[in-house]
Regions:
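PLP-dependent class I/II
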Residues: 1-139
Length: 139
C-alpha cells in the first residue's frame, strides 16, 4: 500500500542515526577541502595572467583569466574568451567550466572535490599550459 503522509519507519531510523551520529566527520571534511583549496590557490597564485578568488566554503574555486585573453596558443589559435581558456586547459588535461556559463566572464571554475594529489597535479598542468601561451609578437 502507499502512504501520502508521514515518514516511513526506515526513513525515521535513518534520520535518527544521522542526528545522533554527531558531526565529527565534518571537521575532517572541512580540513581536507581547506587543504585542497590552499594547494590550488598557491599554485595558481604563481601563474601570470590568473587571479584566484579564494573560496570561504564549498568545493569550487573561481579563477579570473582576463590576463590570458588576447594571447596565442602554440598552434597559433588566439585565446579570446574564458571558454577558450577552458578549452586549452582541457587539452592540457584539466577540466573546468567557463564562467560565461554562469554570466561570470572572464572567469572559470575548477572543482577541488577530488584527491589532494589530483588538485596538485592540476595546478602544475594549468601553470604549464598558461606558460605556453604567448603574445604573438616575435622578437
Amino acid at each position: 500500500s502507499q502512504s501520502t503522509s508521514g515518514a516511513s519507519s526506515v526513513g525515521q531510523a535513518a534520520a535518527l542515526a544521522a542526528f545522533e551520529g554527531g558531526l565529527g566527520f565534518l571537521a575532517e571534511q572541512v580540513a581536507a577541502y581547506r587543504q585542497r583549496r590552499d594547494v590550488l590557490v598557491a599554485a595558481l597564485g604563481q601563474v601570470a595572467g590568473l587571479e584566484v578568488l579564494v573560496p570561504q566554503g564549498g568545493f569550487f574555486v573561481f579563477v579570473r583569466c582576463a590576463g590570458l585573453l588576447g594571447r596565442y596558443r602554440p598552434d597559433g589559435q588566439r585565446v579570446n574568451s574564458d571558454a577558450d581558456v577552458v578549452a586549452w586547459l582541457l587539452e592540457s588535461g584539466v577540466a573546468g567550466v567557463a564562467g560565461s556559463a554562469y554570466g561570470l566572464s572572464p572567469w572559470f571554475r575548477l572543482s577541488i572535490a577530488t584527491a589532494t594529489d589530483t588538485v596538485r597535479e592540476a595546478g602544475r598542468r594549468i601553470a604549464r599550459a598558461c606558460a605556453q601561451l604567448h603574445s604573438g609578437e616575435t622578437t
